[in-house]
């Protein structure tokens, strides 16, 4: 079986989409596979030939504003018009920074609709929320639900079974929300806006305490230097 992984991220190889593809490759044991990175400079004719040869297509893409990147959308539109072979099975993984799954579900529906219009078979979809953590640490890939979802993506392609799409969020919802609030509220304060919630007050208190501690440490260092001199 020939499997093509489509990296739909405009960021190329140094991105979360590629990290996800790297973890799907071990499932291809005994099968041929290739990776197609979608970008403005790609050879569209060559890409079309590759897609026509595929028995299975796995699209991996970030979610931008509730949809998929324009460069990927344009490429899929070209395939819809010019793809001659209609044999491939298609599955998709979309990932977004937001913890909740609404944007991921919308992006998956775009890929599923394209598959139907092109005359291909859509097998399975997986949405991953809060995926920005993967740029900091790979620990999120150890999440049981994420592992099961990725295994289902490859099983649906290889075995030709249709599975219900799902969305997962590898991190902790409360911790993710708290971190995002702290980050965005700090930026708001830098711009002269003062949000007033209990979380903001607590974060402000911790930042003030840290600043006082740092000033005290600097004063102690200065006094020590003066005594030595």
Cite the ranges covered by each PLM segment.
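N-terminal beta1-alpha1-beta2 submodule of the flavodoxin-like/Rossmannoid cofactor-binding fold
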Residues: 1-86, 117, 158, 162-229
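Charge-dense, low-complexity intrinsically disordered segments
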Residues: 11, 15, 62, 66, ...
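Amphipathic alpha-helical segments in well-structured domains
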Residues: 21, 72, 76, 108-111, ...
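A short, terminal or domain-edge coil/loop segment
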Residues: 87-98, 140-153, 174-193
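Short, glycine-/small-residue-rich phosphate/pyrophosphate-handling segment
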Residues: 89-145
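Active-site oxyanion/phosphate-handling segment shared across diverse enzymes
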Residues: 127, 132-175
């Amino acid at each position: 079986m020939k499997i093509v992984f489509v990296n739909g991220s405009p960021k190329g190889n140094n991105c979360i989409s590629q990290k996800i593809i790297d973890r799907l490759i071990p499932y291809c044991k005994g099968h041929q596979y290739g990776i197609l990175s979608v970008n403005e400079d790609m050879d569209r004719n060559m890409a079309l030939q590759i897609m026509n040869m595929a028995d299975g297509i796995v699209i991996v893409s970030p979610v931008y504003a509730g949809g998929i990147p324009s460069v990927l959308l344009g490429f899929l539109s070209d395939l819809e018009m010019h793809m001659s072979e209609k044999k491939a099975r298609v599955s998709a993984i979309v990932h977004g920074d937001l913890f909740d799954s609404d944007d991921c579900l919308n992006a998956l529906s775009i890929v599923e609709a394209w598959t139907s219009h092109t005359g291909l078979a859509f097998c399975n979809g997986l949405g991953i929320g809060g995926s920005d953590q993967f740029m900091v640490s790979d620990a999120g890939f150890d999440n049981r639900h994420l592992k099961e979802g990725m295994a289902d993506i490859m099983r649906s392609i290889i075995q030709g079974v249709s599975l219900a799409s799902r969305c997962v969020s590898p991190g902790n919802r409360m911790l993710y929300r708290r971190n995002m609030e702290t980050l965005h509220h700090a930026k708001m304060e830098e711009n002269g806006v003062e949000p007033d919630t209990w979380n903001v007050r607590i974060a402000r208190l911790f930042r003030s305490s840290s600043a006082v501690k740092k000033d005290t440490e600097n004063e102690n260092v200065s006094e020590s230097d003066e005594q030595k001199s």
